[in-house]
Amino acid sequence: LAARVAAVQGDTDVARACYEQLHGAPGATSSFLRALAMSSSQADLREAWSLFDAMMTHAPQASSTHIPDWIVMLRAAAGDARIPVHRVVSLLQMQEETEAFDTPWNVPPSVQAQLVQSVAAHTALVEGLLERGDVSRAWGVWDAMVHRGVAPDVWALKTLCRLYFVAGHPARALECVMHWCHRGVRLPAPRSGVVRMHVPKVQDLGQCAMRVDATPSSRHVVRLRPTTHLANTLLLGLYRARAWETLMLVWHALQPTLHVQPDTASIDLMLRAARAEARASQVPCTWAPAARAYFVRLLTAQHPELQACTNPLEAPGRRGWIVRSELQLRRWERWMEGRLRRLWRGAADNLPPVTISTPLPHVCLDARVFHHYAELVLTLMEVDFPGASHATTDQLWEELFLIAAWMRALDVTPMRETLCLWCSVHDERLPPAASTASWRTWLAQWLGEASVPSDAELGAWYRAHRAHVD
């Protein structure tokens, strides 16, 4: 198990140590081979090929049972720019329209027959070509796979989404997910023999259609069941493409349309996108308040005891009485402003707020999610949104530090960036003549004296993250 985990993480040294302790056991050999093949070191790659040759030489009759090892080495060859592409794709009996078919692989016919009909082998080939940077040929392999009649799985669809994001066509990635997961695709009948690859230009990938419906003798409709990992790949690609509003719309449709349950990574991407959309929007933002309300609803639904948490700024102590008095005064001001606004507007707002009304998942929120939520709350203090006022800004300021009480109650240790954010904002908005000792004493009691950021650390963080606000 340790060798397999090390192989997944790409830790060649740990995988080698496990392999040596197990004295070359069959399971450890495959894990060690994967660790070597996924390494970026040329020496590790040469060792992987030597180990693979030894495995196939010592047990040639069992080569058909080593299909996963063949797939691992196929991916390694596809990602190695020193090996010509036409030699790599020939293992799956593919050739480009302008290339002659090449057969450089010494592979048993039974193994090649299994690889040709394996969706995992085609996906590994696409991933390797993407690692090489050859997006066009990677698309050609995916197109040839469905033209051959090999039904893709969710992992293959995830790789196709990555392909479109790398090519700069995020809309096509979204269309493919809806096409394969919502409507379904009728694949052609399985075919054997060599398949010709259609390799378009990268800029033309947004208009290229795959060869799936041209054959009249079609099989059943293939409809994939999306997973949370596929959804997170789509959300991450939209975030990197700066399509934040589209990301929020997709996130809102995960459960009702795709029937995908969000996880911690999904919520983290939603908070980051809502903050980025609020920063970039030229009009009052709507998704950021909705994301904030959703997160609070999710947190209090999973942990009702958090509603009893008190603000750390109201911690008892003689040096904190100014801050406590200021908080009480602001609460009275918010109450009065709310009453006057309802009387003036007739209890109706001009713009109804955007809400995220999807069912609440049960997730384990970590320190990074809380940090991005704190950044979202801080952003809402500085941007315009429907219903924004001085009273709501003061309320957000209190909530920013209430996050610390929530994390303490849930036994979640904050990131260093979160501590700097709290201390910096605390010092910025501190009332005149108020002391900073009360807040820092509360942090020291919770995390220890060493956790309180120094003035030099706060200055460096402020110059990197907050200087642009002024």
Locations of regions flagged by a protein language model:
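A basic, Ser/Thr-enriched alpha-helical scaffold prevalent
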Residues: 1-470
